Regions:
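Polar, glycine-rich mid-to-C-terminal structural blocks
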Residues: 31-35
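Juxtamembrane/interface motifs at transmembrane-helix termini
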Residues: 43-45
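Long, distal/terminal scaffolding or interaction modules
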Residues: 1-18, 24-27, 48-357
Length: 357
């Protein structure tokens, strides 16, 4: 983001602007491209510079749309929990009812945690027990120190940009349906997540973990295009997947339950390979994540796996990108030669650039 801001500042300087507000409305600086098949599109009402110097501009602060952020649950309820935690120096819990109109729930609280404590924050400093239907972008961008536990369901973009926080979504105890057979969160969950954890006691919609680059997640089923463009992180899928799994996946690792040995039919194998889960590290990783899933959600399916783990682990497949696997193998090799992790990564990169060890 720093580099994006610097480049933007350079462009603004070339145009003679000091602030973004000064730029808004200056359509006289835009030029229409001459594209043959779009000649019929009339952009005159957008590009007409007649209004560029009009006294009444749409970007006048007095006319800015009021998002009523002072009325959202973060402001009215959750920030009090941060104040309490700061004063008591103890972990704090709070319960709240949510509805599907509560968009970006937890995001404002997360920003205040980051401003107040930075990286020096312990896990689960504030735990929010939410009940009901989460709105879009539930838990977006939340940092380490914040845990959101939702009993109910949630809309699209859950955990978008997750940045170290923890998200738990589980079914109510009184539910009569099987969690692993029902969708509990919407599409594009954990989009662009960089770190943190998510445990989903049910099925996710499409594009689960698209562009995930560092978060750990457990889910009991997914729709189409799961793991799309993933560059890092760990994902365990305990149920059915849709088509086109791992399209464009260049990093990270996924472990997928494949009892019918038909995952290869749904896998986009252009960049990835799949194999049995039989190495000690992989077995340990899968078990630990399923144990966490059971601990946080009480998932019946997780319990089923844990009760007969030796049998079920043989039905999982490991998905890993070809180049990512090569790099991980190189890092492991240099660590075995006595280098620490950072040094091993540097040597592995240099070796990869040269084409081998």
């Amino acid at each position: 983001m720093k580099f994006v801001a610097e480049e933007m500042r350079e462009y603004m300087a070339q145009l003679g602007f000091r602030t973004i507000d000064e730029m808004v409305g200056h359509t006289d600086l835009l030029k229409k491209k001459d594209i043959a098949d779009q000649y019929h599109i009339d952009l005159s009402k957008i590009l007409d510079s007649t209004y560029a110097n009009d006294a009444h501009n749409c970007f006048n602060p007095a006319h800015v749309y009021d998002f009523k952020l002072n009325e959202v649950l973060d402001t009215k309820v959750l920030l009090k929990a941060l104040e309490q935690a700061s004063q008591s120096h103890k972990k704090t819990e709070v319960s709240v009812e949510v509805s599907n109109t509560d968009r970006s729930f937890g995001t404002i609280l997360g920003s205040h945690i980051t401003k107040a404590l930075g990286d020096f924050v312990e896990d689960d400093l504030i735990t929010v027990h939410a009940f009901g239907a989460g709105g879009q972008s539930f838990g977006a961008f939340i940092p380490k120190g914040l845990t959101l536990e939702l009993t109910g369901d949630s809309n699209d973009y859950l955990g978008k940009g997750l940045s170290g926080g923890k998200i738990i979504v589980k079914t109510p105890h009184e539910a009569t349906f099987k969690a692993e057979e029902n969708i509990i969160i919407g599409n594009v969950a954990l989009y662009g997540a960089t770190s943190g954890e998510a445990y989903i006691n049910g099925v996710a919609g499409e594009r689960f973990c698209v562009r995930n680059s560092g978060a750990k997640a457990v889910v009991e089923g997914v729709g189409d295009h799961a793991l799309e463009y993933m560059t890092g992180g760990l994902v365990v899928i305990l149920g059915e997947t849709g088509r086109n799994v791992a399209a464009g996946m260049s990093g990270g690792i996924a472990y997928i339950y494949d009892p019918n040995n038909d995952l290869y039919e749904k896998l986009n194998g252009a960049l990835v390979e799949y194999s049995e889960v039989n190495k000690p590290y992989d077995i340990k990783t899968v078990r630990e994540l399923i144990e966490n899933h059971y601990k946080y959600t009480g998932s019946e399916k997780a319990k089923m796996f844990l009760d007969d783990f030796k049998t079920y682990i043989g039905k999982f497949k490991k998905i890993i990108p070809h180049d990512y696997k090569k790099m991980m193998d190189l890092i492991a090799y240099y660590q075995s030669q006595g280098l620490d992790e950072d040094q091993a990564k540097v040597e592995a990169f240099n070796a990869a650039m040269k084409g081998g060890k």
